[in-house]
């Protein structure tokens, strides 16, 4: 079944030959925003203004705001969010969990709901089909945030008609395959192969992601099962202290699901500057570079966060990369809360030699009500047309100087997707707080990656070949994001195989990009690297823990991970490794209460049918007393059994 929900007064016509949406010509477009609402009057005012309210937790609301008319060239102020196993499961003997060697019986996520919030799902890829050919993806929810549309699909017929959310994306398919794909007879199965799956897809706005989290939680409640949610996307801008509305909302969702987020893949990118002002260093300067490394076109956003509510002074300049000097100084600005300034430079100014840039920049100031910190944002879309003579890059670059009083500090974050930071006047941009802002919440699990394959398979001229990767097995990956936050928390919380992992590949993307290499095993597969791959690996194994102990809370899981993280690897002092490497088996055993006890009996066959026994859960609750033959009706799991004066642990099949 396909369910369309227009989050407002839109209409829809569904026909067997396809899906057609009838939207009025003058229907508004929307901008997704997360806001805090303080009283009922604010709520009514927003509704009267045409704001669509999707979900809320406490006083934090997920909203769609009607877009006001604005210049088509005006830079967007929305944060940029980007989608950041056969071998992987051999590390720390992780596959022992699925094989039953880790705890006496196999754990495969049975009785658990796993979900993703992503983009590019192929719900009928063979890796998601059960033995009867039906998809184990029980529900797909798609958000088209800017159109104000929510689509819910339940079942294979709906998936067949709908096909996919984006034929030009495959990320969700790959991630979900790692999380819970069966492998479809290949060696490339995922982790929680018996879990129920919910896939939510969107354009990766914060609102779309969080609404998807709520959809997964709703389904888990409907079926009465625990939930694990994976979010393999990231964002470089933001306060990086866990106070954003996104982080606060997600922390509340952690009451109802265990949530894992990728740390990001910017661990080798210089997108951050952290500077404490002093008499000797009263300011810090930097240049804006693009990720094409040519600086001809600058598009994106950069934020400068103060440590207090006091705004910092920002001086805008233009740097001449040929003469290595400041060529123009636009001015010095101190942006109070709510201030905004727009700059526009046209072609005629450039042609007349008056100014070397063509385009637009918006600078705004704000004090975050969530943490009391002031931040200045630069959002821009401009060209630097003149090349450096004999070089492949632009002559003129945009430069910024930030000044503050001694003892104050600034954190500068480039968006990383389009913009990087370049040093100036002795400054040294670095990746030392490259962790995704989305993964800075206090009750989420941030996932870094380590290398696990030096060779990856792909199909070439009908033959499967092994292609060298740039990664070493069981080695630190410098691209994995990391950082110590303002409150001292070290991220990521844990690190797992992710460089690279072979998983499912969207058939729709394959058809659109037939020239791109992939592994053809009757259905398409792909070797891909990133913390996006490590995150569902961790989430999948957490699902096996929840199968064993359904009552585990998010706080329990975080504590188990911290207690069992491994540090017996090379370069264990490298900050890319965060709090340590993930050990699925040790985590499962800790969840079950083993705590290193290996002498327990593991077979119910040691008991005679008429023996009197008392059975306790691993948390100590007495759940049975009577003849041993009565145990045959109990659910499978690990229990403590008291027989006369002896105590043993037994695994019930």
Give the role of each language-model region:
Residues 222-235, 239-244, 256-263, 269-272, ...:
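C-terminal subdomain of the subtilisin-like protease fold in secreted/lumenal serine endopeptidases
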Residues 102-209, 224, 254-256, 270-271, ...:
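Subtilisin-like serine protease catalytic core
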Residues 38-113, 123-134, 437, 454:
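Autoinhibitory propeptides
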Residues 254, 269-312, 318, 584-595:
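Secreted peptidase-domain scaffold signal
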Residues 144-160, 317-321, 347, 361-362, ...:
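Catalytic-core environment of secreted peptidases
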Residues 121-173, 177, 190, 322-416, ...:
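Active-site core segment of subtilase-fold serine proteases
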């Amino acid at each position: 079944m396909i369910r369309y929900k227009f989050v407002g007064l839109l209409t829809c016509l569904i026909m067997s030959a396809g899906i057609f949406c009838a939207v009025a010509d003058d229907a508004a477009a929307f901008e997704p925003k997360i806001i805090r609402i303080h009283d009922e009057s604010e709520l009514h005012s927003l509704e009267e203004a045409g704001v669509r309210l999707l979900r809320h937790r406490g006083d934090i609301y997920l909203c769609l705001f009607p877009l006001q008319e604005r210049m088509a060239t005006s830079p967007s102020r929305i944060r940029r969010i980007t989608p950041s196993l056969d071998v992987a499961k051999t590390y720390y003997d992780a596959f022992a969990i699925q094989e039953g060697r880790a705890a006496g019986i196999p754990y495969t996520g049975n009785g658990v709901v796993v979900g993703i919030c992503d983009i590019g799902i192929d719900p009928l890829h063979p890796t998601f089909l059960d033995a009867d050919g039906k998809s184990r993806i029980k529900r797909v929810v798609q958000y088209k945030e800017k159109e104000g549309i929510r689509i819910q699909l339940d079942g294979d017929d709906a998936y067949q008609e709908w096909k996919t959310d984006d034929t030009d994306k495959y990320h969700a398919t790959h991630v979900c395959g790692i999380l819970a794909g069966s492998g479809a007879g290949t060696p490339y199965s995922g982790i929680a192969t018996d879990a129920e799956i919910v896939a939510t897809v969107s354009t990766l706005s914060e609102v779309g992601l969080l609404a998807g989290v709520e959809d997964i939680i709703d389904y888990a409640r409907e079926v009465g099962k625990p939930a694990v949610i994976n979010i393999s996307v990231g964002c470089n801008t933001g306060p990086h202290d866990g106070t954003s509305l996104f982080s606060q909302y997600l922390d509340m969702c952690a009451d109802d699901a265990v949530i894992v987020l990728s740390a990001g893949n910017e661990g080798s990118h210089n997108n951050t500057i952290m500077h404490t002002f002093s008499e000797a260093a009263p300011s810090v300067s930097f240049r804006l570079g693009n990720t094409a490394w040519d600086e001809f076109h600058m598009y994106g956003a950069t934020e400068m966060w103060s440590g207090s509510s006091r705004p910092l002074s920002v001086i805008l300049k233009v740097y001449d990369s040929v003469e290595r000097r400041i060529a123009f100084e636009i001015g010095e600005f101190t942006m109070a809360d709510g201030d905004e300034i727009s700059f526009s430079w046209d072609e005629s100014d450039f042609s007349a030699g008056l100014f070397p840039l063509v385009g637009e920049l918006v600078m705004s100031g704000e004090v975050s009500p969530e943490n009391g910190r002031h931040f200045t944002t630069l959002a821009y879309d401009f060209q630097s047309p003149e090349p450096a003579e004999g070089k492949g890059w632009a002559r003129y670059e945009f430069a910024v100087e930030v000044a503050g009083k001694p003892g104050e500090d600034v954190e500068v974050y480039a968006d990383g997707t389009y913009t990087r930071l370049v040093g100036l006047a002795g400054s040294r941009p670095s990746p030392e707080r490259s962790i995704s802002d989305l993964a800075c919440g206090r009750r989420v699990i941030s996932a870094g990656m380590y290398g696990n394959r030096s060779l990856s398979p792909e199909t070439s001229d009908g033959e499967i070949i092994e292609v060298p990767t740039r990664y070493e097995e069981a080695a630190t990956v410098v691209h994995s994001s990391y950082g110590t936050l303002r409150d001292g928390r070290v991220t990521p919380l844990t690190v797992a195989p992710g460089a690279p992992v072979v998983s499912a590949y969207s058939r729709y993307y394959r058809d659109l990009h037939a020239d791109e290499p992939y592994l053809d095993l009757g259905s398409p597969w792909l070797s891909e690297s990133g913390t996006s791959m490590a995150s569902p690996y961790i989430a999948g194994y957490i699902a096996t823990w929840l199968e064993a102990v359904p009552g585990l809370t998010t706080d329990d899981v975080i504590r188990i991970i911290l207690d069992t993280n491994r540090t017996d690897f090379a370069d264990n002092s490298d900050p890319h490794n965060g709090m340590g490497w993930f050990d699925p088996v040790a985590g499962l055993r800790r969840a079950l209460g083993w705590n290193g006890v290996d002498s327990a009996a593991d077979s119910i066959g040691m008991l005679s049918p008429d023996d009197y026994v008392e059975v306790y859960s691993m948390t100590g609750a007495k759940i049975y007393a009577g003849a041993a033959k009565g145990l045959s009706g109990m659910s499978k799991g690990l229990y403590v059994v008291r027989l006369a004066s002896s105590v043993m642990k037994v695994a019930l099949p």
